[in-house]
Amino acid sequence: MEDKVLLAVAMVALIAVLSKLKSLLETKPKLNLPPGPWTLPLIGSIHHLVSSPLPYRAMRELAHKHGPLMMLWLGEVPTLVVSSPEAAQAITKTHDVTFADRHMNSTVDILTFNGNDIVFGTYGEQWRQLRKLSVLELLSVARVQSFQRIREEEVARFMRNLAASAGAGATVDLSKMISSFINDTFVRESIGSRCKHQDEYLDALHTGIRVAAELSVANLFPSSRLLQSLSTARRKAVAARDEMARILGQIIRETKEAMDWGDKASNESMISVLLRLQKEAGLPIELTDDIVMALMFDLFGAGSDTSSTTLTWCMTEMIRYPATMAKAQAEVREAFKGKTTITEDDLSRANLSYLKLVVKEALRLHCPVPLLIPRKCRETCQIMGYDIPKDTCVLVNVWAICRDSRYWEDADEFKPERFENSSLDYKGTSHEYLPFGSGRRMCPGGNLGVANMELALASLLYHFDWKLPSGQEPKDVDVWEAAGLVGRKNAGLVLHPVSRFAPVNA
């Protein structure tokens, strides 16, 4: 929330706006809106969300009282909260086209170069062409496989760093090391090499994502031009976008020069694919540099954050459940007995069924984006007997759905075995399990995200035993998420790595 001065200005400026809205609404037929908690003038339902620093937790409790379709007012923004598989199916499958737009606030519009991306872009011909391009050219199975050498090199470097710490008897913040590893991997996949400015770019990216997810007055009262002009959130978003554009602009220029000189290595990265397509004639849309930068914003934001978050939660939950850790380690060590390094070819030949269950369960218990990316209702419609007005913001609380005791036995417990003999997958067809969403707006990068995790997770379990610092018990490990769009672990995961099978060159 921004400072009190802006809130005071908001109260004065918006009384007239709300009065006008009230008069307009009185002339329209009364709608049968979904139920919701009582509201206050100006702020709407926001006071109901302060019981937890994590809105999706507070929303789950409210949904227990008001139902799986619940209407909130976040400032002047009507917001539908979806909290059951049946309601999620209605939104993301039955009425998918009606809810195919994204809810755009002013900060997101800035960060995505006026919505020129896939994640937040307006549903239409340009969006369809960009998604098709991403699925076929950037995130295809063949493209993901082409990055195998990069993943293997980065995992090997990660293991060597851990082995050095283990040899010194030191503790490590594994969550930070995982984040660094995933970022390095994704930077190389995206632009072809490590970038000297990658830390500045990622700092600007994370600042932008944080600002976009905040309940700032600019986002709560989008109709007020005064608040938009006074908003510090907008200024932060502009600064973050300009920093990202500066760095990406330099990378684009350097990549174009390398491609012109015939550097084959420059043709292997995602950005080089985009620049090659930009140069070729025949695309149904013009692939401008702004669109390229917006797509890179999507790829970095979705690819790096969600993968590192899920890998951290896998290790966190196995530390909390030692029997699960032992079972996963036994499977990996039996499969790769005698090896000094694990490769992706080794992984493809091995049947690491339990390891895959661990990843599935981590994605259930700790959905990467707990409320998914907000959708918007394109036209007034009926869902489960209720009227949903045009332009309503829609939040699908997959965190609550994936912990619903009606569908999951011992829903708050980490039990990979629950997925044995189960047909549930990441494809968004089973609406009680939607870690990557569903429908037209489902995340297209799930294959790359899982690929960036699996080899690292197997290597962490194969090469090292893991112990908590002295005096800590598994039950003491913090499992609260940090506030924000992505459900990151709030506290660092500090552990003692103990070398079991030393990685090569350690």
Curated annotation (Swiss-Prot):
Annotated TM spans:
5-25
Q: Name one GO biological process term.
A: diterpene phytoalexin biosynthetic process
The record's Gene Ontology cellular component field reads:
membrane
Q: Which UniProt keywords apply?
A: Heme, Iron, Membrane, Metal-binding, Monooxygenase, Oxidoreductase, Plant defense, Transmembrane, Transmembrane helix
Q: What class of enzyme is it?
A: oxidoreductase
Query: This protein's superkingdom?
Result: Eukaryota
Pfam families referenced in this protein's UniProt entry, alphabetically? p450
Tell me the compartments it is located in.
Answer: Membrane
State which Enzyme Commission number(s) the record gives. Answer: 1.14.14.159
Please list the cofactors this protein needs. Answer: heme
Q: Which reaction does it catalyse?
A: dolabradiene + reduced [NADPH--hemoprotein reductase] + O2 = 15,16-epoxydolabrene + oxidized [NADPH--hemoprotein reductase] + H2O + H(+); 15,16-epoxydolabrene + reduced [NADPH--hemoprotein reductase] + O2 = 3beta-hydroxy-15,16-epoxydolabrene + oxidized [NADPH--hemoprotein reductase] + H2O + H(+)
The family note in this entry says:
Belongs to the cytochrome P450 family.
Please explain the role this protein plays, according to its UniProt record: Involved in the production of antifungal dolabralexin phytoalexins in response to biotic and abiotic stresses.
The name this protein carries in UniProt is Dolabradiene monooxygenase
Look up and give the organism this protein is from: Zea mays
